[in-house]
A protein has these predicted regions:
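Hydrophobic, regular-secondary-structure patches
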Residues: 1-51, 58-61, 93-94, 144-145, ...
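Structural beta->alpha junctions
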Residues: 2-11, 26, 42-48, 119-123, ...
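Helix N-cap / beta->alpha transition motif
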Residues: 14, 136-139, 195
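A short coil-to-beta-strand element that immediately follows conserved catalytic motifs
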Residues: 30-33, 153, 186-191
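Mid-to-C-terminal secondary-structure elements
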Residues: 53, 57-77, 81-186
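Peri-transmembrane interface segments
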Residues: 173, 184-200
Length: 200
């Protein structure tokens, strides 16, 4: 036990964490939330499976979508919890095999209809939750609501300002998160981090 709390308690990121980390980690250029879930997608008779990823507009700094059609997630989509999405190229070709540009059409996910606003041509296999081509991106606020997640999200993604690396501030970030969630600073199991920089 630490700070009077059970040693096996569950915790998750909350939206309020973002503002605290942005203030306390000035080396970070972007601090952005991510929610992900493996699920089924459908358009008429076409079905496929993949990752749905709830993101904010500044997630482009983490994983550049390289749009071939349409647009990315915008601030108004977050604010209004809009049911819009950006399709990875593989998902788009499976759900719309006879269409080169399905922007404006709708896909079904867990009984909810999402309007396609963009197509990502990013083919990188580096990504949490699966390859970009098999991912559907949508506003994280909308996905929070659809999944009944309240104010919580799965992962924090960040980039650093020029002159800094994620490796150089990783320990500082981890300690800040542990302080926010009353986690023992020496606990190596409570927090998992993936440094994509080190993969290149």
């Amino acid at each position: 036990p630490y700070d009077g709390l059970s040693s096996d308690r569950m915790w998750s990121f909350e939206t309020g964490d973002l503002d605290v980390l942005r203030r306390h980690i000035p080396e970070a250029a972007v601090v952005t939330p991510v929610i992900f879930n493996w699920t089924d997608f459908k358009h008429r008779d076409c079905k496929t499976q993949g990752t749905v990823k709830g993101v904010s507009p500044d997630y482009v700094a983490v994983e550049n979508p390289k749009l071939s059609h349409g647009r990315y997630i915008q601030q108004a989509d977050l604010r209004d919890c809009r049911k819009v999405c950006v399709l990875g190229e593989k998902i788009a070709s499976q759900l719309f095999p006879n269409e080169s540009n399905p922007v404006g059409k709708y896909i079904e996910m867990q009984g909810i209809y999402l309007q396609v606003v963009g197509i990502s041509s990013l083919t990188s296999n580096v990504g949490v939750g699966g390859p970009a081509s098999r991912t559907v991106y949508m506003p994280y606020t909308t996905l929070q609501r659809l999944l009944g997640r309240g104010d919580h999200f799965d992962m924090l993604a960040l980039t650093t300002r020029p002159g800094h690396t994620v490796s150089s501030i990783q320990r500082k970030i981890e300690l800040e998160i542990k302080k926010l969630h009353r986690i023992d600073p020496s606990d190596q199991q409570a927090l998992m981090s993936i440094n994509v920089e080190s993969m290149f």
